[in-house]
């Protein structure tokens, strides 16, 4: 399939309906405040990556994870659960996610080395790139061989990683 072919516009939403490849912004951003609404189907795995750029020869970016935590048996604070900074830091275990099939509101704030993830009006994750906490978590992550990970100006990406996902009000 051609890039973007499995994404459609339906009821004012961008919807991933079949394997399609990721969707990227044309512009690149380093400092931004990005809000969006999303919902997923049971078992779905998706995400919003940001500061997507070439990091040591691979196109990567930090990810605000969107996933069916229960179906995948992720604890709420897991580094793989919804709202986590995927593979680096889990979101608050007290996060309030709406049931599968209902829209959630998320926000990503990136300013310099400061990153925040929000879910349904509550800040659920905060980290400073370069801090002691960052160095400890980054050193044990799959991104440990990329010392400048998450620091570059880059594109925002809607991830195609399996399952039907809706995005609106981006």
Set out the residue ranges of the language-model regions.
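Carbohydrate-interacting regions of secretory-pathway proteins
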Residues: 1-169
């Amino acid at each position: 399939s051609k890039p973007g072919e499995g994404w459609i516009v339906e009821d004012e939403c961008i919807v991933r309906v079949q394997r399609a490849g990721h969707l990227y912004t044309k512009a690149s951003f380093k400092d931004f405040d990005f809000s969006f609404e999303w919902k997923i189907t049971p078992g779905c795995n998706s995400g919003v990556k940001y500061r997507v750029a070439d990091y040591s020869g691979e196109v990567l970016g930090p990810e605000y994870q969107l996933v069916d935590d229960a179906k995948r048996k992720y604890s709420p604070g897991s580094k793989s659960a919804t709202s986590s900074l995927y593979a680096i830091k889990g979101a608050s275990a007290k996060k309030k996610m709406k049931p599968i099939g209902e829209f959630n509101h998320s926000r990503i704030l990136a300013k310099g080395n400061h990153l925040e993830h929000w879910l349904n009006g509550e800040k659920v994750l905060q980290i400073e790139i370069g801090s002691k906490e960052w160095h400890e978590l980054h050193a044990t992550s799959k991104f440990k061989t990329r010392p400048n990970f998450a620091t570059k100006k880059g594109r925002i990406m809607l991830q195609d990683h399996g399952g039907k996902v809706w995005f609106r009000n981006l």
